[in-house]
Amino acid sequence: NTATCSMHRLADFLGRSSNNFGAILSPTNVGS
């Protein structure tokens, strides 16, 4: 669970830091 939480936080941080990275994780956001 701890590792999963860390991954979620890391993904969220990277997503906010780089829109391109977040777009790759969530292609739906690109459409909208």
UniProtKB/Swiss-Prot annotation:
Instruction: Report which superkingdom the organism of origin falls in.
Output: Eukaryota
Keywords annotated in UniProt: Amyloid, Hormone, Secreted
Q: Which GO terms describe its molecular function?
A: hormone activity; receptor ligand activity
List where in the cell it is found. Secreted
**UniProt KW Secreted keyword:** yes
Q: Name one GO biological process term.
A: amylin receptor signaling pathway
Give one Pfam family, short name only: Calc_CGRP_IAPP
User: Single GO cellular component annotation?
Assistant: extracellular space
Xref: InterPro entries: Calcitonin/adrenomedullin, Calcitonin_peptide-like, IAPP
Q: Does the keyword Iron apply?
A: no
Under Gene3D superfamilies, the record lists:
6.10.250.2190
- Family, per entry: Belongs to the calcitonin family.
Entry domain remark: The mature protein is largely unstructured in the absence of a cognate ligand.
Subunit annotation = Can form homodimers. Interacts with IDE and INS. Interaction with INS inhibits homodimerization and fibril formation.
Q: So what does this one do?
A: Amylin/IAPP is a glucoregulatory peptide hormone that plays an important role in the regulation of energy homeostasis. Selectively inhibits insulin-stimulated glucose utilization and glycogen deposition in muscle, while not affecting adipocyte glucose metabolism. IAPP function is mediated by the CALCR-RAMPs (AMYRs) receptor complexes. Amylin can also bind CALCR receptor in the absence of RAMPs, although it is more selective for AMYRs.
This protein is called what?
Answer: Islet amyloid polypeptide
Q: Which organism is it from?
A: Saguinus oedipus (Cotton-top tamarin)
